[in-house]
Regions:
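Conserved helicase ATPase core of P-loop NTP-dependent helicases/translocases
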Residues: 276-311
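A solvent-exposed, charged loop/short amphipathic helix patch at secondary-structure junctions
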Residues: 2-17
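A short helix-turn-beta junction within AAA+ P-loop NTPase domains corresponding to the substrate/partner-engaging
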Residues: 55-68, 324-329
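SF2 helicase motor core recognition
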Residues: 1, 47-52, 293, 305-331, ...
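Conserved strand-helix element at the start of the C-terminal RecA-like helicase core
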Residues: 175-183, 239-264
């Protein structure tokens, strides 16, 4: 847990802190007082995920003595030593521009890396030579790069975005209390509306194609192209089950029995396009590791054509690449990394 309470003059760099992180820090400090500096071995695939402050937190966890020797007693001191702040104009959440000061770039990098590598043994994907398949050529230009699909907003979506801008102005001018409306709520509503207006208002009707229509169209296109493709089974022979697999990531609109959700809406569109209902599965069906293992086996063996899930549930440890031909990211994870 890298959420160790950290104060900073740059508001975006401060960490409020969590109980698990504080507990972990206290236990390490206790062991360090009793047994010396070498008290823990830590492994992580994301030493920096949400904020540059996490680099400072990791050094506090692992080698606070090096920070002390360098005369660094706070994040502000660390940032002044190894980074530079820049104040620039940037786009605000509701449109328009605002001044924002942020930790923009590193300085004294060799010195910082020397301190970092005393405790950290860093291995990149290139160092490990991890086998990663090539991205298929884009139909538009033949380049092996991610393809971004741009959709025009419907008039209804444009009207809603305008209302969000009005809400943001009211929050900024303190015409409403933070319990009534705030920028976090506004940002969340904007993300929901960008996926589908029905996530903010179930009765919304849009006059044109929406994002889920485009997603379904592309999934069905790949399915039609690869539904007859043959694959090898675990014995090396030809599998009797034909067809490929596609993964769909969406962190919003997850399955909900009590209200409209994007997952089931997408499934309906795929079924209407000719895909068998039992070929479309949700990662949320798997309630435990055993159920997840069975679902992944069905995906590897060709009994699942589309597996839909969130980053939290399907972003790590998803061993289903045998038949994988496409990944569709319907929305973006709400984190920098």
């Amino acid at each position: 847990d890298k959420n160790l309470a950290t104060s900073a003059t740059i508001q975006a760099a401060a960490i409020e802190g969590s109980q698990p992180a504080s507990d972990l820090h206290r236990k390490r400090e206790y062991r360090r007082d009793r047994h010396g500096d070498r008290v823990a071995t830590v492994a992580t695939a994301t030493p920096l995920a949400n904020s540059i402050t996490e680099a400072y937190v990791m050094q506090r966890y692992l080698r606070p003595d090096l920070l002390e020797k360098a005369g660094i007693t706070s994040f502000d001191g660390w940032a002044a030593t190894f980074g530079s702040q820049v104040t620039e104009m940037e786009m605000g959440p509701a449109g328009g521009f605002r001044q924002k000061t942020r930790f923009a770039r590193f300085q004294n990098v060799p010195e910082m890396l020397r301190m970092w590598h005393v405790a950290a043994d860093v291995k990149t994907a290139e160092d490990l030579k991890l086998p990663v398949p090539e991205i298929a050529p884009r139909p538009s230009d033949g380049k092996r790069e991610v393809e971004t699909v741009v959709l025009q907003p419907t008039p209804e979506l444009e009207d809603y975005i305008s209302s969000i801008a009005d809400r943001a102005e009211m929050v900024a001018s303190r015409q409403v209390s933070s319990t009534e409306d705030n920028m976090l709520l506004i940002s969340t509503d904007g993300r929901k509306a960008a996926l589908d207006l029905r996530l903010v208002d179930e009765d919304s009707i849009q006059s044109g194609p929406v994002k889920l229509d485009a997603v379904a169209s592309r999934i069905l296109h790949h399915w039609e192209q690869t539904r007859g493709r043959e694959y090898r089974d675990e014995t090396g022979g030809t599998s009797p089950v034909r067809g490929s697999l596609q993964l769909v990531f969406s962190d919003l609109g997850t399955p909900n029995e009590r209200r409209w959700d994007a997952y089931n809406e997408l499934k309906v569109k795929l079924i209407q396009g000719g895909m068998p209902a039992d070929a479309v599965r949700f990662i949320h069906e798997a309630r435990d590791d055993n159920a997840k293992g069975r679902l992944f086996e069905a995906a590897r063996s060709g009994h699942v054509a589309v597996l839909i899930g969130s980053t939290a549930k399907m972003g790590v440890g998803t061993n289903v690449q045998n038949r994988l031909v496409a990944m569709h990211h319907v929305d973006c994870p709400w984190r920098p990394a």
